[in-house]
Amino acid sequence: MVRYNAVEDPLCYPGTHVLRNRANIPDQNELDEFEQLMFDSRAREALPDGDLDFAHYRALHRHFFQDVYEWAGQTRIIRTGKGENWFCYPEYIEREANRLFAELAARDHLARTESKEAFAKGASWFLAEINAIHPFREGNGRTQLVFLTMLTRYAGYELDESKLEPKRFLDAMIRSFSGDLAPLAAEIRRMI
């Protein structure tokens, strides 16, 4: 099953939609298992320090996916999307990500929100934007969730990932792609 629409992806094994990987696993299901195993292993380690900027975001991606992909932490080089929604074209990723993270910094990384509801609303804006940019070929969702956890702590709250309902969260992310942030804000609020 094809998970993403992609244009001429040199990162895949020829004739497949399976990303080339350090373990040389040509089967998507096996790669998914290996990727999650490596992610979980790296999650037990200290996270990279940073300033909650795009360089820090890329360092987080590199940390979690370095054992799986040579390009971990590097921005996407091909056009890709899901369903009928295309993500930011690769030639604009750096500019758009830097714009987004500058705006996040101007908002003090959401640390000065007056309530959990206000934080959830701001976090939903950020997640919708970074998801539309989709800077990496794979691993965007997990990197987003790690970064959301960091933002939540920076704002003085805790994110309870045990309350994450994947289907509801994914549906909310999809709706956010067309500008409807309310379901995503509600999902974030439910977890803090």
From Swiss-Prot:
Catalytic activity from the UniProt record: L-tyrosyl-[protein] + ATP = O-(5'-adenylyl)-L-tyrosyl-[protein] + diphosphate; L-threonyl-[protein] + ATP = 3-O-(5'-adenylyl)-L-threonyl-[protein] + diphosphate
Coiled coil: none
Residue ranges of the TM segments: none
Nucleotide-binding in keyword set: yes
PROSITE patterns registered for this protein in UniProt: FIDO
Top-tier EC class: transferase
Source superkingdom: Bacteria
Domain called Fido: residue spans: 52-190
Entry's family note: Belongs to the fic family.
Role played: Probable adenylyltransferase that mediates the addition of adenosine 5'-monophosphate (AMP) to specific residues of target proteins.
Protein name according to UniProt: Probable protein adenylyltransferase y4lH
Species this chain originates from: Sinorhizobium fredii (strain NBRC 101917 / NGR234)
